[in-house]
């Protein structure tokens, strides 16, 4: 007795046997290319931004799931660094626990893989003021948080400091002033 193999008998074309020439992709004839090309990120907000408004802007080689450096709140109460850490957590954004003084934050974040540049992009971006910049400490610098980016490119901040007893204040910077600052995105 000879076994029949699949190539030994005639088959009907797919269009005849199934009534269609359309294939299926896991139960659907439509392939969601956006899902196939999406950049993975474990943080939901970061995932939305890297696959949405920032898709064509992120630096080459940027990895959204870089090490965050977050080991818990390590900043002294009411310091600018305490507020930046606390506010980022409130907004569900990554932030490191040991970035140093305000003026050191951009370099510390960059070393861990954060996207840092001089363009405010989203509510929650950390603003890094260099030593003495816009009234910041000439020794320590300063950090704040972007709360709003206005249509004209100006930004509204939330900031704290030791003398404020944990009560943040707000300032507005023009687009030209904002362009002189550094921003930690995610």
What residues fall within each predicted segment?
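Aromatic- and glycine-rich peptidoglycan recognition patches
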Residues: 147-186
């Amino acid at each position: 007795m000879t076994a029949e193999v699949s190539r030994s008998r005639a088959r009907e074309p797919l269009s005849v046997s199934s009534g269609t020439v359309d294939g299926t992709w896991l139960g659907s004839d439509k392939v969601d290319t956006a899902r196939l090309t999406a950049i993975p990120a474990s943080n939901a907000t970061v995932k939305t931004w890297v696959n949405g408004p920032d898709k064509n802007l992120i630096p080459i080689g940027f990895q959204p799931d870089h090490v965050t450096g977050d080991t818990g709140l390590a900043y002294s109460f009411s310091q600018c660094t305490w507020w930046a850490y606390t506010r980022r957590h409130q907004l569900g954004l990554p932030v490191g626990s040991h970035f140093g003084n305000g003026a050191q934050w951009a370099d510390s974040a960059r070393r861990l893989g954060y996207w840092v540049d001089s363009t405010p992009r989203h509510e929650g971006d950390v603003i890094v003021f260099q030593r003495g910049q816009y009234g910041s400490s000439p020794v320590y610098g300063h950090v704040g948080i972007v709360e709003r980016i206005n249509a004209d490119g100006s930004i509204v901040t939330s900031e704290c400091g030791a003398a404020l007893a944990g009560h943040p204040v707000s300032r507005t910077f023009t687009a030209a002033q904002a362009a002189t600052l550094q921003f930690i995105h995610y």
